[in-house]
Swiss-Prot record:
Chain's gene name: Abcb6
SMART domains according to UniProt: AAA (SM00382)
The organism's taxonomic lineage, starting at the top: Eukaryota, Metazoa, Chordata, Craniata, Vertebrata
Residues passing through the membrane, by range: 27-47, 73-93, 107-127, 148-168, 186-206, 264-284, 292-312, 376-396, 398-418, 500-520, 530-550
Domain ABC transporter: from-to ranges: 590-824
Function noted in UniProt: ATP-dependent transporter that catalyzes the transport of a broad-spectrum of porphyrins from the cytoplasm to the extracellular space through the plasma membrane or into the vesicle lumen. May also function as an ATP-dependent importer of porphyrins from the cytoplasm into the mitochondria, in turn may participate in the de novo heme biosynthesis regulation and in the coordination of heme and iron homeostasis during phenylhydrazine stress. May play a key role in the early steps of melanogenesis producing PMEL amyloid fibrils.
Enzyme class: translocase
Post-translational modification: N-glycosylated.
Name of the molecule in the record: ATP-binding cassette sub-family B member 6
Topology term for the membrane: Multi-pass membrane protein
Cross-referenced PROSITE patterns: ABC_TM1F, ABC_TRANSPORTER_1, ABC_TRANSPORTER_2
Molecular functions (GO terms): ABC-type heme transporter activity; ABC-type transporter activity; ATP binding; ATP hydrolysis activity; efflux transmembrane transporter activity; heme binding; tetrapyrrole binding
Region (Required for the lysosomal targeting): 1-205
Length: 842
């Protein structure tokens, strides 16, 4: 009968890691299987969430030829399955050849851990093959290679089998093949070596992901491959292309163009390194104090050691490294670097948004774009803070701790720290992923609860009309109860996470403390070493308590940063051609020659539009809504590029000159004037930001609004409110006219500038506009035909075509569309609409 003895072959909890010309089998088969299982679980955690986010393939069908190469993939599956069975076969071989010998406990643990690690590898192999076929079925191009986690697992497995060769001369291993047991174990090692080597080589080739040929059959009614790509992209894993994201992020770490800030970055990195040294030195001096007290050392030595310890503790802080002098100094110095980074990101985004076309802006919600900008900026600074000053230092502390305990204590202490930290990180990631759904549900319900309250209060009068106060309170109570139920789940899952972390910390501390106590009892370590171990481990676990928060925040920030970079990748539709020069303005002759334009493919907004505006002339564009009148102005201002034809100013194609020079010669008074939430003076000065106060007032006088401005309590310093809502329609139009007068453009574009005003305001503003347009080339879009009767030329536009042109009298005598429009408007002016009659408001 075979029984289980001590964990290792030696007496006591553990023996040395290196003994008898080789690694201790106990140490080796504890380190390797635990490392492999850690890598396998981490790889699964990173891949499986992405699998859940994948969209199932639709009606597309993937031909067999596009599938994986069958024979190599079957071999890969066979080797992965064999690798899973070999550890258990090795344990069975040990049991069969033991014959009354008590088996050490590490053999049982190693067999279980190795098998579980192989299960993770086999699972990943199948999952990635399924994802590859699904991606091909959706017409999404992918790189035919395994995930980094799976490749790393196979690489470390093969490297571990090679590592065993360093113990070739050790009698503890099976290399001598002295008996049946060693012969069996040697044969199993050969199988493991061949298996792991085969998986490593096949993994680099990835036959399960590489198609023989790319043949995609799609049903005719579902040939929108682009749509599938969009869906796939929107659901991509947060950790996908991690290397590219880190490279993009690192570009913001180094403040280019600022030597002083670059020096500060180096100082901050140096301080971060000093913090790592302090985290080692503080427990060491604490150990020395305990040893000196135990040995009853002289007061001078004790006082010096205590003073040094307290000074180091002052530099380090209250045990966590987050409140000490060094950390606070680093935080203080980093403020300028963080501001430089956020300023650079914000300005880059803001500048890019202004470079994008009007078409892009009209197709996006401004609030959504601004959220991307805000979150993108915060994500860059947040990721730099979390990664550089939280995650990397914590991982560095773990590595330093493993190296320190392995070198100055025993390799088993390093192994204990490694196992506990690995288990801690894995469980934190797994539980954090699990509880994410509770947090999402809670946030959704919180928004719904708030929306219900807001909706009820906004409809206060309606609630009173129907006496529904009790009903609204009941609905709100129901929403609160539902929110609190989800809040309980989220909080309870957080408690589970904290208790799981606490359990791992306790188990690690228990194992290390027992081992340390054993070595102290054997007089291999001192009492101070026991204190050092407990202090160092507790200090090490402190920042790890926030690892779950860091993990979620990094995920969120990566998503926000990805959205920001997607925004930066938006192509600028209207660009200056290479070598474009400024517009050379002479007299202001405008020519449209055979212009075609469409906002969307297949729907032409303008068709073969041709006309000429001579210098100083006024041309009016009239016609029904949607005919293309405003489009003509936008094309002249070059908000869009035309599909075909040519637009010239003084004989120069506007697509061949710089946009800024073109627009500097054009002034626009739109139908709906939007003012900035600023003073009246600054809104007028926006026409020419370098203008002085006297020039602003002169422009206001020319626009006929100077006296009205002076009647305000604060005069020109009056705030107009958001979008100018504190001013009347006529006042806003006059501010827009004053702004255009101050710009002093050579060409004026009036887009139904008075259509929304009453008759008295319209006449007054028409007089102001007449002054602005004197001796300037002008194009007017008019809704009321009476405002353009004196135009040099009137163009009647319908369905994107010019159907009539001429002066007012000639068009009336022709009896066409213009004459019909004129007659209808004259009849409308003679009849007072019912809505305009005075109403009894009593």
């Amino acid at each position: 009968m075979v029984t289980v003895g001590n964990y290792c072959e030696t007496e006591g909890p553990a023996g040395p890691a290196w003994t008898q010309n080789g690694l201790s089998p106990c140490f080796f088969f504890t380190l390797v299987p635990s490392t492999l299982l850690t890598l396998g679980v981490l790889a699964l955690v990173l891949v499986l969430p992405r699998r859940r986010r994948e969209v199932p393939a639709g009606p597309e069908e993937l031909s067999w030829a596009a599938g994986p190469r069958v024979a190599p993939y079957v071999l890969q599956l066979f080797l992965a399955t064999l690798q899973m069975a070999l550890p258990l076969a090795g344990l069975a071989g040990r049991v069969g050849t033991a014959r009354g010998v008590r088996l050490p406990g590490y053999l049982l643990l190693a067999s279980v851990l190795e098998s579980l690690a192989s299960v993770c590898g086999l699972w990943l192999l199948v999952v990635e093959r399924s994802q590859a076929r699904q991606s091909l079925a959706m017409g999404v191009w992918m790189k035919f290679r395994h995930s980094l986690g799976l490749l790393l697992l196979w690489t470390v497995t093969f490297a571990a089998e090679n590592l065993a060769l360093v113990s070739w001369n050790s009698p503890q291993w099976w290399w001598a093949r002295a008996d049946l047991g060693q012969q069996v174990q040697f044969g199993l090692w050969v199988l493991r070596y061949v298996t792991s080597g085969g998986l490593f080589i096949l993994g680099l080739w990835a036959p399960g992901l590489r198609p023989q040929s790319y043949t995609l059959h799609v049903h005719e009614e579902d040939q929108d491959v682009g749509g599938n790509q969009g869906r796939s992209t929107d659901r991509r894993s947060t950790w996908r292309d991690l290397g590219r994201k880190l490279r993009l992020l690192s570009s913001y770490l180094w403040p280019r163009g600022s030597p002083s800030l670059q020096l500060i970055v180096l100082i901050c990195l140096g301080l971060m390194g000093l913090e790592r040294a302090l985290n080692v030195l503080v427990p060491i001096f604490y150990r020395d104090i305990v040893n000196l007290l135990t040995a009853k050392a002289p007061w001078s030595s004790l006082a010096w050691t205590v003073t040094t310890y307290v000074f180091l503790k002052f530099l380090q802080g209250g045990g966590t490294g987050s409140t000490g002098f060094v950390s606070n100094l680093r935080t203080f110095l980093w403020i300028r670097v963080q501001q430089f980074t956020s300023r650079g990101v914000e300005l880059r985004l803001f500048s890019h948004l202004h470079e994008l076309s009007l078409r892009w802006h009209l197709g996006r919600r401004t609030g959504e774009v601004l959220r991307i900008v805000d979150r993108g900026t915060s994500s860059v600074t947040g990721l730099l803070s979390y990664l550089v000053f939280s995650i990397i230092p914590t991982l560095a502390d773990i590595i330093i701790g493993i190296i320190y305990f392995s070198m100055f204590f025993n390799a088993w202490f390093g192994l204990i720290v490694f196992l506990c930290m690995s288990l801690y990180l894995i469980l934190t990631i797994v539980v954090t992923e699990w509880r994410a759904k509770f947090r999402r549900d809670m946030n959704t319900q919180e928004n719904a609860t708030r929306a219900r309250a807001v909706d009820s209060l906004l409809n206060f009068e309606t609630v009173k009309y129907y006496g529904a106060e009790g009903y609204e309170v009941d609905r709100y109570r129901e929403a609160i109860l539902k929110f609190q139920g989800l809040e309980w789940k989220s909080t309870a899952s957080l408690v589970v996470l904290n208790q799981t972390q606490n359990l791992v910390i306790g188990l690690g501390l228990l194992a290390g403390s027992l081992l340390c106590a054993y070595f102290v009892s054997e007089q291999k370590l001192q009492v101070g070493d026991f204190v050092l171990f407990g202090t160092y481990i507790t200090q090490l676990y402190m920042p790890l308590n926030w690892f779950g928060t860091y993990y979620r925040m990094i995920q969120t920030n990566f998503i926000d940063m990805e959205n920001m970079f997607d925004l930066l990748k938006e192509e600028t539709e209207v660009k200056d051609v290479p070598g474009a020069g400024p517009l050379r303005f002479h007299k202001g002759r405008i020519e449209f020659e055979n212009v075609h334009f469409s906002y969307a493919d297949g729907q032409e907004t303008l068709q073969d539009v041709s006309f000429t505006v001579m210098p100083g002339q006024t041309v009016a564009l009239v016609g029904p809504s949607g005919a293309g009148k405003s489009t003509i102005l936008r094309l002249l201002f070059r908000f869009y590029d035309i599909s075909s034809g040519c637009i010239r100013i003084d004989g120069q194609d506007i697509s061949q000159v710089t946009q800024i020079s073109l627009r500097s010669h054009i002034g626009v008074v739109p139908q709906d004037t939007v003012l900035f939430n600023d003073t009246i003076a600054n809104n007028i000065r926006y026409g020419r930001v370098t203008a002085g106060d006297s020039e602003v007032e002169a422009a206001a006088q020319a626009a006929g609004i100077h006296d009205a401005i002076l009647s305000f309590p604060e005069g020109y310093e009056t705030q107009v409110g958001e979008r100018g809502l504190k001013l009347s329609g006529g006042e806003k139009q006059r501010v827009a006219i004053a702004r255009t007068i101050l710009k002093a453009p050579d060409i004026i574009l009036l887009d139904e500038a008075t259509s929304a005003l009453d008759t008295s305001n319209e006449r007054a503003i028409q007089a102001s506009l007449a002054k602005v347009c004197t001796n300037r080339t002008t194009i007017v879009i008019a809704h009321r035909l009476s405002t353009v009767v004196n135009a040099d030329q009137i163009l009647v536009i319908k369905d994107g075509c010019i159907i009539e042109r001429g002066r007012h009298e000639a068009l009336l005598s022709r009896g066409g569309v213009y004459a019909e429009m004129w007659q209808l408007q004259q009849q409308g002016q003679e009849t007072v609409p019912e809505e305009s009659k005075p109403q009894d408001t009593a």
